[in-house]
Amino acid sequence: MNGSLDHPDQPDIDSIKMFVGQIPRTWSEDQLRELFEPYGAVYEINVLRDRSQNPPQSKGCCFVTYYTRKSALEAQNALHNMKILPGMHHPIQMKPADSEKNNAVEDRKLFVGMISKKCNENDIRLMFSPYGQIEECRILRGPDGLSRGCAFVTFTARQMAQSAIKSMHQSQTMEGCSSPIVVKFADTQKDKEQKRIAQQLQQQMQQLNAASMWGNLTGLNSLGPQYLALYLQLLQQSASSGNALNNLHPMSGLNAMQNLAALAAAASATQATPTGSSALTTSSSPLSVLTSSGTPSGQPAQSAWDAYKAGSSPTSSTSSSVNPMASLGALQSLAAGAGAGLNMSSLASMAALNGGLGSGGLSNGSGSTMEALTQAAYSGIQQYAAAALPSLYSQSLLSQQNVSAAGSQKEGPEGANLFIYHLPQEFGDQDLLQMFMPFGNVISAKVFIDKQTNLSKCFGFVSYDNPVSSQAAIQSMNGFQIGMKRLKVQLKRSKNDSKPY
């Protein structure tokens, strides 16, 4: 169907083929032409029909092509979500057809930064007009109407935009700007969504820093003072190695070690004391000193150390039997305060113990168990340091893990294999591997892909070389929010059991 005689045989090179939905199934091409022609000369209308019926019936949608791009955009602005046709319940849907996506606005739109605030739209158009026809030029302005020093420029073709980037990016430094001009493709909606998710993930990882090491100590409530002593031993050894965090108070590691010693002494005294009383009194307890926020930096540790040297006694009638392991959470104030930076290795060892003590095999205080406990602590240093303090942990250590695990489907021992639901659509094998590496040695990480669409099914498997790591991952990552959903992390079903764990 050709248009009127005052038009060429073909539409303009930048014309758009539009898809139109929510039209009556009884309408013919002539009726549709009457609908579209008020906005410009129509080159072609093609009603989509169901060929399985005889005669073929309209599907209630069509394609329309105007001679000019301007006419198509005017029709879209006037009709899309604006007009409801007779017999229909929803407004017309009008948008560029899928075949036009290769010339979508996002592929032709440039962001221009570091421009002089004295420039107006005409100046920017003049600057970019040598590279092709400009469809739109807009300077970003604040509430006061003043330029923010950046703009969006949309060309009619992607090649023009690419030429502008190649010639203009960092080609000059404009008046009042500290850096050369920036010319790049503007962020698409997908780019913005990915940035939002990444920012949200970073914030949640920061929250995880505190929770992953201190919030998970509740499972250790039944353990005795020998484990406190081991914490102290690990802290002493790591402090003597000189592997302390930079930019923190030099005495903070010693302070933490002294406080742990006081805690260990108090815990020992607690077990030696009858049930009715406790060495951890409200008046002289090292814990009460530890949690005091009004004391200047350095003094809490010294006070606790003095209490340890002098010995604690149940002098208060309101003695409480505070659980020594649960009370370890008081050390969080040391790690969070300005004067309290625990040695990195000691934090890692403590976090490793936190994961290692959760397994059923480490339930008594025998010598062999203590040796196994120490081994578990040191083997987990790198893994759990990344989980507890990712912002302070060297990324090079993470890269030492077997990156080839991404995409493989190798299974670990019983209880070391995880099933992860609600993964973001854009997550791949490598993303899954990076997310679960901090909790242990990952031997495989696989996101499942739909073979027909080649898109993620939003679930996957992760396998560790030991069950302790998988439990630590479940404890920290189950319920972890990414975007609008929360991850669901659980053990993979046993080969010998049809029911989940």
Curated annotation (Swiss-Prot):
Residues of the RRM domain: 16-99, 108-188, 416-494
GO biological process: cell migration; determination of left/right symmetry; developmental cell growth; digestive tract development; embryonic liver development; endodermal digestive tract morphogenesis; lens fiber cell differentiation; liver development
GO cellular component, one term: nucleus
Top-level taxon of the source organism: Eukaryota
Main location (coarse class): nucleus
Biased composition (Low complexity): 274-298, 312-323
CDD domains: RRM1_CELF1_2_Bruno (cd12631), RRM2_CELF1_2 (cd12634), RRM3_CELF1_2 (cd12638)
Presence of keyword Glycosyltransferase: no
GO molecular function annotation: mRNA 3'-UTR binding; mRNA binding
Chain positions covered by the region annotation Binds strongly to URE: 2-196, 397-501
Keyword presence, Cytoplasm: yes
Region of interest (Disordered), ranges: 274-323
UniProt entry keywords in alphabetical sequence: Activator, Cytoplasm, mRNA processing, mRNA splicing, Nucleus, Repeat, RNA-binding
UniProt-annotated location(s): Nucleus; Cytoplasm
Assigned protein family: Belongs to the CELF/BRUNOL family.
Function summary: RNA-binding protein implicated in the regulation of several post-transcriptional events. May be involved in mRNA translation activation and stability. Involved in the regulation of muscle-specific splicing of alpha actinin pre-mRNAs via the binding to the UR-repeat element (URE) at the branch point of the non-muscle (NM) exon.
PANTHER family noted in UniProt: RNA BINDING PROTEIN
Protein name: CUGBP Elav-like family member 1
Gene: celf1
